Amino acid sequence: MPTINQLIRKERKKVIRKTKSPALLECPQRRGVCTRVYTTTPKKPNSALRKVAKVKLTSKVEVISYIPGEGHNLQEHSIVLVRGGRVKDLPGVKYHIIRGALDTAGVAKRNVSRSKYGAKKAKAGGDKK
């Protein structure tokens, strides 16, 4: 605990919090345009072809963002909504594309966790045996 004299000589240091998604500029989401849609491979020990897109945001920053879910309709010049959230096994990917918003279609035939993938509720009675 500092004394009054110590505080007069040198004031308390402000805590500077570093954001994990700086390109969003403190916003929850940002709109952007896809400049390149491609697949990439994850770090060891995982193996897959992860779908990612390079997106130019309205904040004039170009970021690499992950396309979640099975299958997508994105191509160059698609307008997308980007949120924060990294992908642990893809270095440099710190953003996610929101499915079901703007030009991005929701995941087809998705029954669980639908809200995360922009999927509409299936018609009742269509899944009976």
UniProtKB/Swiss-Prot annotation:
Organism superkingdom: Bacteria
Residues carrying 3-methylthioaspartic acid: 89
Disulfide-bond pairs as recorded: none
Keywords assigned: Methylation, Ribonucleoprotein, Ribosomal protein, RNA-binding, rRNA-binding, tRNA-binding
One function term, GO molecular function aspect: rRNA binding
SUPFAM superfamilies, per the entry: Nucleic acid-binding proteins (SSF50249)
Any Gene Ontology biological process: translation
Subunit structure: Part of the 30S ribosomal subunit. Contacts proteins S8 and S17. May interact with IF1 in the 30S initiation complex.
General function of this protein: With S4 and S5 plays an important role in translational accuracy.
Entry protein name: Small ribosomal subunit protein uS12
Organism: Helicobacter hepaticus (strain ATCC 51449 / 3B1)
Gene from which the chain derives: rpsL
